[in-house]
Structure formats: structure tokens, C-alpha cells
Amino acid sequence: MHSLQRKVLRTICPDQKGLIARITNICYKHELNIVQNNEFVDHRTGRFFMRTELEGIFNDSTLLADLDSALPEGSVRELNPAGRRRIVILVTKEAHCLGDLLMKANYGGLDVEIAAVIGNHDTLRSLVERFDIPFELVSHEGLTRNEHDQKMADAIDAYQPDYVVLAKYMRVLTPEFVARFPNKIINIHHSFLPAFIGARPYHQAYERGVKIIGATAHYVNDNLDEGPIIMQDVIHVDHTYTAEDMMRAGRDVEKNVLSRALYKVLAQRVFVYGNRTIIL
């Protein structure tokens, strides 16, 4: 007796009439129940995006073969189990984003398995170990950037995570590192991108006299702070704020934006197309 499973079908394809009917009819043929369905058409690119949450008894290979025969050429589809995902978190010294994720994972605010936390400094070890989660130190001292990234990537691979989360990990990643985890690395940047790219954005914002500050969660690609944006938010500031005041206020925005972005990613709601995201 097979037990019911829940899976998420994600489809990107050239837009045509009748796509929803084709996909849902195949799901019906396989006696699968559609729990939730969301779709979007990008008229500028002519692309159709659909996320379908299914429940039933699955034969993945025949389901995907039937979909391939029904969808237009150039379609991309994937079928993955719904539910909990596994992450590795990379850190340096700042605790606010890491602490927020640890608390939410521990108390049910975020349905995720934190397999490990890896840092290039030992500063946050005691915080992590309070939650009975492994902490690994991979120091960058005496190593080139390529050598350190190689060691970090090997350490991450040992845990086989679905995603790598940069919770204020303050090192620029090499293209070789990024290539090992395509569209799997999520970063929180302490500004409302594309403004104030790079280091010390709060000091840049202070010098410009900005009236809002923000944070951006994005996928990491080869270009610094230019990967597809997942989530952003801002708060208002004024002339009385020092750069340090902005930093303190910004930390709350950063941790909230990161956890909200991660919630969407873990639920398999974020589609990457080009340098944009579609969230369904």
C-alpha cells in the first residue's frame, strides 16, 4: 500500500494557449490532487510560469514524460518533494541574522533543517552550539581567496544542503565557488540594491543624506551584489540618524528580509529567469 506524497511541480515554458489545461489534465490522468496552483505570464519575454502543489501516489518518470510530450519546445519542468529543506549557513562575526534564523528554525517560525553553520571566524560558535547545531571553522588566514573558497565549498558539500545562506558572511565569493552552487546561494545585502553596492553601505547612505534605508535578499552570481533579487524592504530615517544609528536600525530590516526571502525559497515559490525572480 503506497502512502500519499506531496510534491511541487514547477514549469517554465514559452507561453501558449491552453497550457494550464494541458498540465492539470495530465495531473488528473495520474490521479493527483491539485492542492494549490499559481501561474504568471511574462508578456515581455513570452514566458509562462506555473507552480503546482500536488498530492497523491507518484510515478515521477511517467508523469514527467507525459508533461514533456504536452509542453512546447524549450520548456523546463521539475518535480520535487514538498516540505522541509536543508541549509548550511555561512557567517563571519555578526550575529543578528544568524540568531534570527536559529530561533525561527528552533521554534517553528521557519520550516528548515539547519545542517551546519560554517564560519571564517570562531566568534559565533557558542551561539550556534546552544542550538545543538554543528559549527565548523574554516579560517581564511594564510590562504588565497581561491584556496579558502575551495575549502569552504568542500565543507558545505559534506552536508549536501539544498541551499547555502550567507548570514552576513563578509567575504566576496569566487566565480568557481558560485558555479558549484548555481541559484543555491542566498545573500542578505545591507542596502536597498542597486544603491550602495559593496562595503560600508550605511556610511555611504549617511554621506548622501538618504531618507530611507533598506536591505535586499538575493541569489548570488558572479557579479558582486547583482544577483536576482528575492525580497527587499525599507525603513524611514532622517537627518538626526548617525551612520551608527542607521546600522542599528538596518539590522532589524536585514534579518526580517532574509527570513522572509528564505521562507519563499524553501517553499519552492521562487523562479529564477535571467536576472529576475518570479515568486508564485
UniProtKB/Swiss-Prot annotation:
GO annotation, biological process: 'de novo' IMP biosynthetic process; one-carbon metabolic process; protein hexamerization; purine nucleotide biosynthetic process
SUPFAM superfamilies: ACT-like (SSF55021), Formyltransferase (SSF53328)
GO cellular component terms listed in the entry, alphabetical order: cytosol
Pfam families per record: ACT, Formyl_trans_N
Keyword Cell inner membrane in record: no
Catalytic residues, chain numbering: 225
Keywords of the record: Hydrolase, One-carbon metabolism, Purine biosynthesis
Catalytic activity: (6R)-10-formyltetrahydrofolate + H2O = (6S)-5,6,7,8-tetrahydrofolate + formate + H(+)
Subunit structure: Homohexamer.
Known role: Catalyzes the hydrolysis of 10-formyltetrahydrofolate (formyl-FH4) to formate and tetrahydrofolate (FH4). Provides the major source of formate for the PurT-dependent synthesis of 5'-phosphoribosyl-N-formylglycinamide (FGAR) during aerobic growth. Has a role in regulating the one-carbon pool.
PANTHER family registered for this protein in UniProt: FORMYLTETRAHYDROFOLATE DEFORMYLASE, FORMYLTETRAHYDROFOLATE DEFORMYLASE 2, MITOCHONDRIAL
Protein name in the entry: Formyltetrahydrofolate deformylase
Species of the source: Escherichia coli (strain K12)
